[in-house]
């Protein structure tokens, strides 16, 4: 063993992981604001030029469309909980954490009709240096949520 061993530079990894830890807290606050139906607090977490790709489309939508979509969910459902939250760092092409947050969890909702729904959820959020969400990508079975409501109403 030589005294002149190369020491790996982990500064980029450490910096990315620190950004992830900060942004993970912001992601959690965003979900909590949705659950509390505090639309203004939730929207404050997003940059004005944020791009939203909801689960039922491949479109890149605006912050105004996000507000409209979240208003719809908050209007249709009495209550939500987001269980089993798991947060993981997103990575760049070299597998270095880039500050983005990958979120897994299970949404449980009570529809205005009284029907309950359960849906697995995955998202990726990217943040700017001000700690605002600039990109929000979501995946879950939107149709399945409303199929659950419909099947309970038929019984």
How would you label these PLM feature ranges?
Residues 30, 41-43, 50, 66, ...:
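Hydrophobic pocket/interface hotspot
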Residues 92-99, 112, 126-132:
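A short, structured loop/turn motif at beta-sheet edges
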Residues 134-155:
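Low-complexity, intrinsically disordered terminal/linker segments enriched in charged
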């Amino acid at each position: 063993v030589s005294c002149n061993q190369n020491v790996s530079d982990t500064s980029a990894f450490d910096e990315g992981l620190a950004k992830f830890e900060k942004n993970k807290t912001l992601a959690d606050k965003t979900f909590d604001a949705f659950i509390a139906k505090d639309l203004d607090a939730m929207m404050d977490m997003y940059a004005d030029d944020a791009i939203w790709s909801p689960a039922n489309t491949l479109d890149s939508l605006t912050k105004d469309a996000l507000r409209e979509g979240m208003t719809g969910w908050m209007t249709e459902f009495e209550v939500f909980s987001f269980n089993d939250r798991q947060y993981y760092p997103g990575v760049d092409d070299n597998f270095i954490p880039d500050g983005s947050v990958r979120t897994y969890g299970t949404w449980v909702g009570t529809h205005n009709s009284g029907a309950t729904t359960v849906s697995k959820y995955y998202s990726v959020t990217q943040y700017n240096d001000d700690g605002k969400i600039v990109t929000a990508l979501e995946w879950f079975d939107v149709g399945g949520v409303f199929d659950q409501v419909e099947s309970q109403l038929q019984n």
